[in-house]
Amino acid sequence: MSTNSIKLLASDVHRGLAELVSKRLGLRLTPSELKRESTGEVQFSIGESVRDEDIFIICQIGSGEVNDRVFELMIMINACKTASARRITVILPNFPYARQDRKDKSRAPITAKLMADMLTTAGCDHVITMDLHASQIQGFFDVPVDNLYAEPSVVRYIKETIDYSEAIIISSDAGGAKRAAGLADRLDLNFELIHKERARANEVSRMVLVVDVTDKICVIVDDMADTCGTLAKAAEVLLDNNAKDVIAIVTHGILSGNAIKNINNSKLKKVVCTNTVPFEDKLKLCLKLDTIDISAVIAESIRRLHNGESISYLFKNAPCK
């Protein structure tokens, strides 16, 4: 059992997930203040001593504000480091720039590696994330990384809300096949893949379905929903092939650009996202949106890490609500 206490910190901008986690742990959020000067520079201060404490910084980053939130996070980490915190763990459920994990064209940067370098340079000792877009990002770090999975929480949601005896798990591309197949195995369901051809980024020109989905509840699973164009087209293809209903379940609801319009105008019955990304404002604009709360997973990972217990239990099991 660790003798130093847990201190939870969160940005002033998105505190929803941090507040849920703090309630589950029976802890208050450590007082802090983040101010933006007229010059655009950020000042951050911690309202009490964090010397020799176990710090957990919970950072939710919304769509369209990535760069500001990332730099604010670096300042928060460095403030804890210079205040002599014993250990600083950053909880980034949706890791920024995760899709830029390799050189996919000449002279392109590997920005996910830059993110890892920035976090460690700022003073981060440990990172907790969820459903990394590319698992090899863990290898970019010189500090420990725990990549949690939303799958156990998704399994619970499906069992509680869907007549899954009539369901089939769908992956909208080859990249998500492993994730969808794993979920299908957990539920003892069939898994199928939709082949998609892209004309350009975020734009799907053609989708091909090679299985019979007649009278099936099709559950499309993916790690993130951005503009939701792919999900909308997938739903159309599935329903044109006599599917009963189409539900999308994604870990990271980025919901950028015309996402809400695309969902509202689509044939999707429901789009379910975890709260790794803040999208409370969008819930009011789209009745098809639903949320899976992963605060229990984050809270339990904090408790286990602080007490020196294994986190691998959470890879296959969802904590009690």
From Swiss-Prot:
It is an enzyme of class 2 (transferase). InterPro entries: PRib_PP_synth_CS, Pribosyltran_N, PRibTrfase_dom, PRTase-like, Rib-P_diPkinase. Mg(2+) binds at D131, H133, D142, D146. It catalyses: D-ribose 5-phosphate + ATP = 5-phospho-alpha-D-ribose 1-diphosphate + AMP + H(+). GO terms for cellular component: cytoplasm; ribose phosphate diphosphokinase complex. One of its GO terms (biological process) is purine nucleotide biosynthetic process. This is Ribose-phosphate pyrophosphokinase 1. Keywords: ATP-binding, Kinase, Magnesium, Metal-binding, Nucleotide biosynthesis, Nucleotide-binding, Transferase. GO terms for molecular function: ATP binding; kinase activity; magnesium ion binding; ribose phosphate diphosphokinase activity. The keyword Magnesium applies. NCBIfam families: PRK01259.1, ribP_PPkin. Belongs to the ribose-phosphate pyrophosphokinase family. It holds the Pfam family Pribosyl_synth. Its EC number is 2.7.6.1.
